[in-house]
Amino acid sequence: MKVKALILSSMFALAGCDKMGQNAQDALPNPSAAQEQAAEQAYAAFKSIDFEQLYTYFEPELKADFIAHEHEMRKFAKSIPQQEITNKKIAAKYIEKSSDKPSLYLVSYEYAYGNKNLVKYDVGFDKAGGSNKIRKFDVKVFGASTN
């Protein structure tokens, strides 16, 4: 009986934590229309290996970092699925504040593809509703095949 009560109370506690986490996500603002558009167009440029276009969305520091590692970035961009995206959503939003770095508003997107691939795409801006220049750009591919 005590074990059942302990398990039940643990389930309620975990459900409450999940609800609190969702409320915290909902409290953060969504990206502005300009930020959303920059994020989508930057992902499309990366996916199509159009780095000249991609760099137009970046802040100077991120652009310099990409240029320094462009060969590796081009190889990785080829692994991005080329099929149509079947589902797209904002998975998470974060605000990072640090005394030694500028603030960062990070939005995590999940792009699902019909061939059972999932792309997690993190894009960072200075703040929610702020500049549409990208400060952080990270892409991860999950799945069986990229063809």
Residue ranges and their predicted role:
Residues 37, 52-102:
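Short solvent-exposed beta->alpha transition segments
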Residues 91-147:
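Exposed beta-sheet edge and beta->alpha loop/turn motif
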Residues 17-48:
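Short, low-complexity N-terminal intrinsically disordered segments enriched in polar/charged residues
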Residues 1-15:
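Sec-dependent bacterial lipoprotein signal peptides
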Residues 50, 68, 78, 127, ...:
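Non-catalytic interaction surface on structured domains
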